[in-house]
Amino acid sequence: MAEGYVAPGFERVRDAFEAGLEEELGAGFAAVRAGEVLVDIWGGWADRERTRRWARETIAPVYSTTKGVSAIVMAWLADKGMLSYEDAVASLWPAFGAHGKDKLTIAQALAHQAGVPGFINPIDPDLWLDPPACAAAIAALEPMWPPGTASGYHPLTWGYIVGEIAMRAADRSLGAILREEICAPHGIDFQIGTPESEHARAAEVKKPSRVADFGEITPPRRAAFFTPWAAAKRGSSQWRQIEIPSANGHATALGVARLYEVYATGGEISGERLLSPGAFAQLVAPRFRGDDLVLPFNIDWRSGVIGNSNGFYGPNAEAIGHSGAGGSCGFGDPKAGVAAGYVMNKHSHHLMGDPRSLRLIEALYACL
């Protein structure tokens, strides 16, 4: 059974969530509109042994759903004049300009156009746990395609690039900016860099039983996902504590929904303006659309988030969102004025558009 709150008229969402719990280990789903909580429900188990119930305060690693939140932080930095989307990454980080990456803009890096989706040659997997060293290693990479000419999803490296840009622009880490400037003032439960004191409430992940279907394993896909060193020791205590702005956010479903409300409201959280209209327009401006060189989709890339061209985030083309490994997602829909977040700990093999989230989103829109 689901626990939590459902506003009158949104019972269909709870029914869909409870019907889907048979497929879950544990999960949460939340939706907000104009600062009002419409749905905030959870259920199932927070651990693989099924000894710890999923609770209101349970946080789950949301993997690449983190990217849409990091994109908001980058827009905040642009709004404060600390960076410009059209700046070359190398203007803040000269070493990144190696091997012809010198003209790549921050906007292009956010849209996965840098050409460095992973390490094709062997690395020590512990490198991922040392963000400054990992960022330096990424800066030294030769791009796998001419930067700025195509998109190829950077599942992990995106976060080290963005994190280094933020650190150089603001002299603070991206996770600290998120915590101090956005989450703490609004009481939002979303962390990039989760202190050890919070780990007891973190859900354990159950890995998928099958591998995602990427089609042909090309060199960019291999570098991004299919080398023995492509993962960053996910789930370890050290992994939870460091900041990976592409991959290791930990949150409740409500935390995801409240941050993605920025995309539904033109830059506001609970009625308070976070981003100026100009900064928000740059955040959601189309940056590149085409067949991605890593993910097997045609993707409408914005400044770190995804337009709804594939229908993963409800029926409206105006929606903006991002999905994470295993099934999590967050989105905001300015046409409907609604934002939602889905988190879980039983991972599926779906790269985007997990059927579990699609059913919940369909039920949500049926209630609007």
Regions found by a protein language model. Give the residues of each.
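Active-site-proximal alpha-helical segments within enzyme catalytic domains
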Residues: 112, 158-165, 247-269, 328-345
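Short, gly/Ser/Thr-rich active-site loops of penicillin-recognizing serine hydrolases
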Residues: 244, 265-269, 279, 284-291, ...
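Flexible glycine/proline-enriched surface loops and loop-helix/loop-strand junctions
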Residues: 55-57, 141-148, 158-161, 236-245
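Active-site helix/loop module of the DD-peptidase/beta-lactamase fold
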Residues: 56, 61-65, 69, 77-121, ...
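Structured C-terminal helix/loop/strand segments within mature extracytoplasmic catalytic/sensor domains
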Residues: 323-368
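Short, charged, amphipathic alpha-helices and their helix-cap/turn boundaries
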Residues: 41, 124-146, 172-189, 230-232
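Active-site Gly/Thr loop motif
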Residues: 204-253, 281-336
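Short, conserved catalytic-motif segment at the N-terminal edge
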Residues: 3-62, 82-84
